[in-house]
Amino acid sequence: MTTKRKPYVRPMTSTWWKKLPFYRFYMLREGTAVPTVWFSIELIFGLFALKHGAESWMGFVGFLQNPVVVILNLITLAAALLHTKTWFELAPKAANIIVKDEKMGPEPIIKGLWVVTAVVTVVILYVALFW
C-alpha cells in the first residue's frame, strides 16, 4: 500500500555541528582517527623497512627525521592523548563500581587508568631502550 502523502524532511545544513560546542568537540574527537591512520601506515612502512635490511631501515629512520614527519607525529600524539583522555572520562560512566554500599566516583577510575597508562609506557620504554 502506497501513500501520496509527502513526508516532512527537516532541512539540515552541512554545518549543523558547528553551532554547539558539544558537537564541535565531538567532531574533533572523532577526527582523531585520521592521524591514527597516518601512524598505522607509518608503522607498517617501518616494519617493511626493517624486514628488508639495514639500508632500508636507515632510509626509514631518515624519513622519520624529516621535520614534516616529526610535526605529523606530534599532531598524532596530541590526537591520541585527546582520544585517550575522553575515553578514560567515559569509562567510569560505563562501569558501576560499588565499594561499601556507595557508588565510586569517576576520579579514582580516571586516575587509575592514567597510572596504568604511565606504568605501561615506562615499561615499554625501558624494554625498548635498555633491554
Swiss-Prot record:
Record's bilayer topology term = Multi-pass membrane protein
Keyword list, A-Z: Cell inner membrane, Cell membrane, Membrane, Transmembrane, Transmembrane helix
Q: Which InterPro entries match?
A: Fumarate_red_C, SQR/QFR_C/D
Q: Name one Pfam family in it.
A: Fumarate_red_C
Q: Where does this polypeptide localize?
A: Cell inner membrane
Q: Which domain of life is it from?
A: Bacteria
Q: Name one GO cellular component term.
A: fumarate reductase complex
Q: Where are the transmembrane segments?
A: 30-50, 57-77, 109-129
- Provide a Gene Ontology MF annotation, just one: succinate dehydrogenase activity
Q: What does this protein do?
A: Two distinct, membrane-bound, FAD-containing enzymes are responsible for the catalysis of fumarate and succinate interconversion; fumarate reductase is used in anaerobic growth, and succinate dehydrogenase is used in aerobic growth. Anchors the catalytic components of the fumarate reductase complex to the cell inner membrane, binds quinones.
What the record says about family reads:
Belongs to the FrdC family.
Give the record's subunit note. Answer: Part of an enzyme complex containing four subunits: a flavoprotein (FrdA), an iron-sulfur protein (FrdB), and two hydrophobic anchor proteins (FrdC and FrdD).
How is this protein named in the record? Fumarate reductase subunit C
Q: What is the lineage of its organism?
A: Bacteria, Pseudomonadati, Pseudomonadota, Gammaproteobacteria, Enterobacterales
